[in-house]
Structures are given as structure tokens and as C-alpha cells.
Amino acid sequence: MFDPKKFIDEAVEEIKQQISDRKAIIALSGGVDSSVAAVLTHKAIGDKLTAVFVDTGLMRKGEREEVEKTFRDKLGLNLIVVDAKDRFLNALKGVTDPEEKRKIIGKLFIDVFEEIAEDIKAEVLVQGTIAPDWIETQGKIKSHHNVALPHGMVLEVVEPLRELYKDEVRLLAKELGLPDSIVYRQPFPGPGLAVRVLGEVTEEKLNICREANAIVEEEVKKANLDKDLWQYFAVVLDCKATGVKGDEREYNWIVALRMVKSLDAMTAHVPEIPFDLLKRISKRITSEIPNVARVVFDITDKPPATIEFE
């Protein structure tokens, strides 16, 4: 039986020993994994830790503001926010292969972290890597940017949650007193919306994806299903379909909805979702977001599918 209090005590001591009197930075996304890793590390080394949030331009709506409010204002962590939108989007121009996208994003993250580390004289990079991340990477299912790190990286990596699964991390978050908005926050892929925009990442598709995800999250929460579902999100497919706007033909993007239940992300199943909820989401996406012709719902379990499309 997992004992969160015991784990916290042991992890804090282990982090102290690993980092010692050196400075460290942590890659902070605002999700539960990196948040727990940040609080544990802060308990261990205090102000020798600097949290770094990289605004890649691939984040959810309001993500940056939420991170600043929670970690700088409420939790009092040293927080650096890096605006790297142009850098990431330029590097992704013309790239359609999902593994290539993940590798480009992973390399850019490390470049940014190493630059910050050099500025503040940090020697250690703390990450919120959990067990499913490295299991999927080793199994060559898909690369996780926080596992497939580039050779020659100068920072030493510390991963206090490496052997844990998401349900255990949530128990730690509760024990550490993190707000419910973080404890129950649904998992979000490290490469962000880049893997929810199939094919080439463009500003148009990113904007559609960001707005569609905001609508899905809002409607699922209104239906009180947010704590019941493991993940619920929207994906912009790399193809278009014919639709009708007024009396005119249109040829625009297809948005796919994905909603699954899971305990640890190693397997997942699609539950029966109220049809009126799906209809509401579809109506809002097609009426509120320009250039969307159609909304579809993915009913594939994991396996054979993965939870994310890319």
C-alpha cells in the first residue's frame, strides 16, 4: 500500500543528498507531476531551487497566467517565465512526423533550461518524470520529451517521481496541500498542443485546438464528469471535410474529441458519454470557432490506440 507521508519524508532526504548544496532548476508545466516534484524539491533545498516555465506557444488557454498565480503568488517559489513561442513555432515549421516534433520540442526545452541554468549557475535539472513516461519511451511507443534527453546535456537530471504512477502522484499532491485545481488536473502532454495538432503545427490549427480544448474542459466540468474522466480533450486532424455555412459550401478542419477513463495511463477505456454533452460540445466548437466543419468522437480504447493521437 502506497504511503504518501512516508514517501515524502524519504524523497525529501534523497533529494537533499542528490543535490547537496548545488543550485537546481525544475521544468514546471503546471501539471500535477511537475508541481509535486517542485514542492518536494523546494522542501529539500529551499531557495536553491528555481522553477522555470517555458511558454512554448503550445500551451492551453490561460496556462501561463495560472502557473504564475499558483507558483509565484500562492506557493512562493522562485519562478522564471521564458517566452519562447517564436523559437518553438519556427523550429516546427514544415515538420509533420510526430516523433520528429517530439524530439525537436525536447531538444529546445533542454536548450532553454541550459541557458537559464548557466545564467543562475545551476547544475541540476529536476523533472516530474513518472513511470508511464519512460515505459512508453523504452517500449518505442512514443518518445517523451522528459525521457529522451539529448546526449551531451550538461545538467545532472534528478527525477524524484520516476517510479510512481499518476494515482500515487495525486495522493502526494493532496498530502502536500496542493489545491484541487492541480491535484485533479488532467494529464497534459509535455509537447503540448503540438501533438494535438496532427501534421504540421500552424498558428491557425493551434488556435482552433486551444479554443476547442477550452470548450471541452468547460463543458465536461459543467457536466460534473471532470473527476470521473482521466482525460478529455480535442484534437485537430490533418485533413478537411465539406460542410455547410448558411447556404454556402465550406471545406474546413475536422476536430476529434477524446474522453477516457484510466488508473495509471498504461491502459484506458472509453466510457459511455452522455450524448447531449457531445452534441453541446460539437455545436459550440462549430459555431464559436472559425474554420471547423465537423466534430467526431474517438471510441478507441488503449490498447490498441494510445491516449494522445501523436
UniProtKB/Swiss-Prot annotation:
This is GMP synthase [glutamine-hydrolyzing] subunit B. NCBIfam families: guaA_Cterm, PRK00074.1. ATP binds at residues 29-35. The lineage of its organism: Archaea, Methanobacteriati, Methanobacteriota, Methanomada group, Methanococci. It comes from the Archaea. Pfam families: GMP_synt_C, NAD_synthase. It comes from Methanocaldococcus jannaschii (strain ATCC 43067 / DSM 2661 / JAL-1 / JCM 10045 / NBRC 100440). It catalyses: XMP + L-glutamine + ATP + H2O = GMP + L-glutamate + AMP + diphosphate + 2 H(+). It is an enzyme of class 6 (ligase).
